[in-house]
Amino acid sequence: MIRTMMNAKIHRARVTESNLNYVGSITIDSDILEAVDILPNEKVAIVNNNNGARFETYVIAGERGSGKICLNGAASRLVEVGDVVIIMTYAQLNEEEIKNHAPKVAVMNEDNVIIEMIHEKENTIVL
């Protein structure tokens, strides 16, 4: 059986920009992407903690060290600058792969700096 499992999460990032007139996507600081192993053009699910919106888009790599989290195109209608968001990717894994799967979670501060990296095999952490 194949199951869809959370693979990476950027937890409590703050939206730094919103650009309605761009063709789409979310731009994320490349340092953050590398920390959680999210690739450019990878599909992401986004949850807005401020208004409850949930949506999907794809990733564009942003300038390193910028802390940039910019929603582009139609997705920009679902956020305001300063909103707290959770950005996730998922992987489809078989039962054997699941046994060794450890999602990467980057916990962010209010300046979009990683303050903690979590590599857990079991979902035992409450944030």
Curated annotation (Swiss-Prot):
Substrate binds at residues 57, 73-75. Pathway: Cofactor biosynthesis; (R)-pantothenate biosynthesis; beta-alanine from L-aspartate: step 1/1. Gene3D superfamilies: 2.40.40.20. The keyword Lyase applies. One of its GO terms (cellular component) is cytosol. Catalyzes the pyruvoyl-dependent decarboxylation of aspartate to produce beta-alanine. This is Aspartate 1-decarboxylase. It comes from Staphylococcus aureus (strain NCTC 8325 / PS 47).
